Amino acid sequence: MTPLVVLLRRTPAVALFTLGHVTVFTIVGLVRDQSFLWVYLPALAASIAIVVWIDHRWGPIPVVLLWLLSIWAGMHLAGGLAPDPSGQKDILYGWWLIDGYLRWDHLVHGFGIGAATAVLAFAARDSDRPLIWGFVLAQVVGVVNETAENIVALFVEGSNVGDAVNTAWDIIWHLVGALVAVIWMTQRGIPGTEFGRAGRLDLEGEIL
């Protein structure tokens, strides 16, 4: 069996949930004529391929972390394709959850990079400093995402990608999400490892 089939057979609920929200938000994007849909779908396919590779090479990735990744994907698709319920912006990413302080955009970036930090720390669990590796690699994921979005925005009219200030806030929330994940794993352990329930880790991976 291929690595993708192995992963799908191991986590059918996550696969169905992912298929469901991808289908829903694809329809939403088509109905609303959101051109960025044709950027999101290939990016999502590439992201799934990376997850499958990590699962095959360093897995199996714990199901709870796969759920977090799927939820992040759904939040991201909703943010770029669904409308802002307040009517102030064209897409959900512009929706202020707490006026002047927290937008949907901030929440998605923080949650997503936090989830990526946990997955990458799990992948680096056999290294001397898994939490540091998870933190650093997750920031790389964030930078790649921001770079790709801004490059594509140069060629896609009406992409709704923000300006430099928005990008700076995205990076700040990447740091916040990763720090929250690292602090949580410092106290509770890396999910899916032998210390995930039985002990805590310091930043260098030593048992406390």
Regions of interest found by a model, annotated:
Residues 1-161, 183-208:
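Bulky hydrophobic segments
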